[in-house]
Amino acid sequence: MPRWFTALFWSSIAAGALVVGLSSWDALIASPPDADPVRPRAVTITRDQWGVPHIHGRTDADVAYGIAIAHAEDDFRNLEEVLAAVRGRAGAILGEDGAKLDFAGHLLDAQAVADRGYASLSPATRALVEAYAQGLNDYASRHGHEQRLQGLFPVTGRDIVAGFVLRSPFFFGMDRVLGPLAEGKLPPRDAGPADERGSNAFAVSASRSDDATTRLIINSHQPWEGGVTWWELVVHSDEGWDFAGANFPGAPFPLLGHNKHLGWANTVNRMDLIDVYKLELNADRSQYRLDRQWLPLEARRVWLRVKYGPFVLPVPRTVYCSRHGAVILNEKGGFAIRHAGIGEVGQVEQYYRLNKARDFNEWRQIMAMQKVPATNFVYADAQGHIGMFYNALFPARAAGFDWKGVLPGNTSKTLWTSYLPWSADPMVVDPRAGWVANANNTPTVATAPDENLKAADFAPEMGVETFTTNRMHRFAELFAGVNGPISRETLLRIKFDKAYSKASPAGRWMAAVLTVDTAREPELAKAQALLRQWDWTADGVGPADSLAVAVLASVGREVYRGDALPPAAPKLRAAVDWLQGTFGRLDVPLGEFQRLRHGKADLPVFGGPDTLRAIYADRAADGRRVGNNGDGFIMLVEWPAGGAVRSQSVHQFGAATTRRASPHYADQAPLFATERWKPVPF
């Protein structure tokens, strides 16, 4: 359990435990708001042979209602947890892990931000989120036995908007800022997302393909289970909303995929969008200085609900706020946090409009709204346009300050209040090379070398990342190796590539492992000898694959974040002990070591950390490496010359990943493990 959460408030537990009726306290004081007006809905939900819902409604709002119903049928558990976090009650279900989210929600004041900005959304968007909330309420009222948290429903359109407000900053590293500050430490200079598991996205134009077809590969890496796992859907409305793709629990529309005209994929980017300020406080820490004024430090009492055994314990905390944003007080002082998109509710508006964009110009106009503060977009369309957009809401920062460090909070010179225009974002559009790609890397590597952007073109105050993953190294190497047109088969071979580039950080780590002094360690010397035979692929063919994957996975997070690498000898020893202890040998076939497991499915799966066929995993009780992230929902979208869009997809498990009794709990796992596709009826 993260220390920052424990340090934050477990000292309050003793007092909280004295409260009577702890087992029912949370439900008794829960006071959900009144529901939005209930309206009749005209919607049908049909499911294809794989259980994927195809939702048709008279209006867009009717479709959103159907999305809620269908998603709840497949995964009410995660929907309930997401909604509980929005209401500040996740801790009542999930204990400490949930209470971390609750504290963050209070600190960022997500619900109040949604309330203040709700009227700024268009009537159509408000109708959409309210219809989605109505669908969740109707499902919950008919399936009360599934509810673990009493008093959560009804939810409202404002709750749906608040969910976007809460989750958005965590996609660009808010957890890596909050954690250290709550522990009394300073955040790392390069915050960014904590997770090394990334995403891939790439597109090939009709001019470069061998059959005049524009192709897009959607390959976002998300956890295979939980509140940000992909769920596939297809939607159609009589108002012209036609889209196939996937979303997260709590989203009233697909977040990526394609319509008839265009599509996009997303990957996480790691630019610097969060600033931390050291406040100048008065003696009792009730005021802070800004320029020549002493201003009151706003304070608000909140109660966290923390499940502990059969009880839900009330834990009081105080959250603080300055003009900069949320404030954390610790033994080092007061630290304010300001992030891109602070106070913004328009993410839902922009995603909804993107779903219905009809051409490249309209899509770009919608992107220029800048309501989605971060995430790369890789784009393709029926007209043959492709592009890589390093989408970010860059603060308009003053020169002369160390924006990666802790900033002085006593001067308005560091308190930015506006953003650079979207046109300032790094982007590569319709390159002559006919391909674009992103794999959580610097935007200066996105296509052929002679058409890539130059780092010098972007001011240091923007905080654009400079790191290149193994996956992007492989994209560049594989595309460079194609002379002439790119066929569909070549594109899929690139997608499922399982190799490591010696020029990548993973390659440099393996080089360090191979130079460990093993003169007095015969077991490690044997392991090194095996690794020297490795062919640098995790395809399950050679005898060294399992050892290589174990060694590379041991530093996956450090490699992804660009952190200093640890000494190699202990990591090599740990990998050797793992394989010897589990199998009694080092040359274990990768298919025996690395598995996909879900219900009765227990299958070999190939690839590794930071390969284009990405498999991230945890060590299971039986010593196997069991996948939990990486390649998951994957979609291939094609616009043939003069023809209608067509697509194929696959999910690591199936349409109903939390319904063990469903035939679609794990029916796609065999397809996924063997790198096969299913059609998407559209």
Language model features with spans:
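C-terminal/peripheral segments of proteins
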Residues: P2-A511, R520, K526, R532-F682
